[in-house]
Amino acid sequence: MAMLWLIYEGILQYSAPQLQLLPHLLLQQSVTTTPLANMAVGGQGAFGVVDYQSLNIIERPQSGSVQIEGTTDSDVNAGLRWGVKQKEYGALFAANYLKQQGDANFLNGSDADRKKTDILFKVNATSLLGARSPQQTEFTYQFIDDDSYRSLLGITAADWQQDSLQLYSATAQDNHQGRQHKYQLSHQVDLGDSRVISDFYYQSYSQQLDQLGAFNGQNIGLGTLYDIAAFDRNPSVNGDDINMLVQDNDYSAFGAQTQAINQYGEHQITYSARYHTDKAEMRFGDQTALWQADRSIVRDESNSVLAYTDDATALTSAIDSLWRWQGMQIKLGLTYEHVSVNREISLVFAGLDEADFSDSDWMPQFGVLYDAGDWRFSTDIRRAWAAASAGNLTQEAQESLHYQVSAQYASEGIKADLRAYVQEFDNLHVDCDSYSMCVDTRLLTQENIPDVLSYGIELGLGYQWMLGEFELPLGLSYQYLSAEYQTSTCTDIQGCVLEGDKLAWLPEHQLQLSAGIEYAQYQLNLVAAYQSERDFSQYGSELQRVDGQWRADIAANYDIDKYHRLYVRVENLLDESLVTSASNSGIRVENGRISYLGYQWRF
């Protein structure tokens, strides 16, 4: 139930995890979600991760593709991938450029533009002459540049009912600029019954972020939101004062990790170790501006308000073992992590405190799996732990016990998966995020919620139906989640809650249906997703509830031949007004219906 941490190529951030960019879909090889825990990446990953892997070098002398698509909103996306593999050497170059205009509506005629450039380069070499064991060394470089409209301000409920895609022109200059570089050297050696994988990495990220922070000297709340809406509808002759929160942040990380996978007959033992250090230099400023009668914005010079540097160093070691006897498998694991955290203040601000502490703990795991042919049954118990961040005044770690039982069935095109789990949190970390618009010291802090109980059920069904020359893949996924506070508590970020209250924002029920048809060179796929009503009574919000929502997407492909493909995709087919967040800073929604037409050439 805790937030899933994002990792890319096994790299997990500690300081300022929000300072990162994810690669475009066309440059991803796979995305793997581990909702329960991934101990190998340390304490943060012990609460689940979403792991992005970049494109692999294809084992072919030459391969590649060119793809271009446009949308009904005049968006353009173009991508290129080219790879070679000659004897012991291989290389890959991939790039993608995205330009989006968006379908948001500003009364001053502005656009919610986005431009994003991705570049990926890889080169590898397999065993050279004289090598005693098969091995491979690979170097990866990745570059991502993002320039986009990014605002946390929503709209009032009345404006949402009238035009859900409206944006207030006070945010027309809310902008994000980010640039990320990543270098990674990986080495793998096969020693017969064992395999050793090692990685060395360095990454840097620079961010400039301007966002509306105050209106007429007051922080954004429900009252000021209505005032902003009123001015946008009927601007005053003299205009109104606004303040921009200006950020100039830099992040860097370096680390090394290794994993040794040893096979002893049917049994397997994996040893892993990791060293990671990162630093986030955060600089905040205030910039006054005049929102004029023509809805344009004239900005003054910005003034520095606060500045601090967070750095963290983590040492992680783990041992995982898998013991097999006939149809029985027993999994035993133990992880240890030591984290040192420091915060230095270079420009003092009220509510911002320095920090210098370290923490460590053990994370054991026990699991049993029984394979009965078509059926598989398993149970898993583990303890999860994550050190506090520099903004946690009490320096309390996040701790929980996870329990899970599951059953899987697979036979003749039918797949079924049923899981039930319980998570007992002794302490749960909360940060200022999409629940509310934070432009004060809440941005700098991490708070603690004691005693949270979460439990749920997940059901997945899949069937591959063959009807003559037609292939019809069908799927169903259902999730039930309940998360409750076990103790009454108050925090600055979420406000006050009572024992038995539900955690805000989490839907109890989620359902996804998928259906497709494949015939010769034609493919058609439909996906429909449902989320039950969600509650917003916490995080200082007076917006109590958002009703259940449906979203449907459809995609169709036509393969002209083995080299050329045409495709059409329609997202939000029903053109629903889908709420992504709601608080005293307003309601924000996804884009409306948008259609894509694309072409792909493979060679």
Show which residues each predicted segment covers.
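Membrane-embedded beta-barrel scaffold of Gram-negative outer-membrane proteins
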Residues: 186, 195-213, 369-384, 396-466, ...
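Structural signature of Gram-negative outer-membrane beta-barrels, strongest in the C-terminal barrel
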Residues: 251, 264-278, 287, 291, ...
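Transmembrane beta-barrel wall of Gram-negative outer-membrane proteins
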Residues: 63, 70-99, 107-151, 175-190, ...
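Surface-exposed extracellular loop regions of Gram-negative outer-membrane beta-barrel proteins
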Residues: 88-106, 114-118, 205-253, 312-348, ...
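Gram-negative outer-membrane beta-barrel transporters
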Residues: 263-266, 324-330, 339, 410-416, ...
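Short acidic/polar hinge/loop motifs at secondary-structure boundaries
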Residues: 8-35, 121, 155
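Conserved C-terminal beta-signal and adjacent last beta-strands/turns
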Residues: 83, 89, 124-128, 142, ...
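A beta-strand signature from Gram-negative outer-membrane beta-barrel systems
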Residues: 21-63, 602
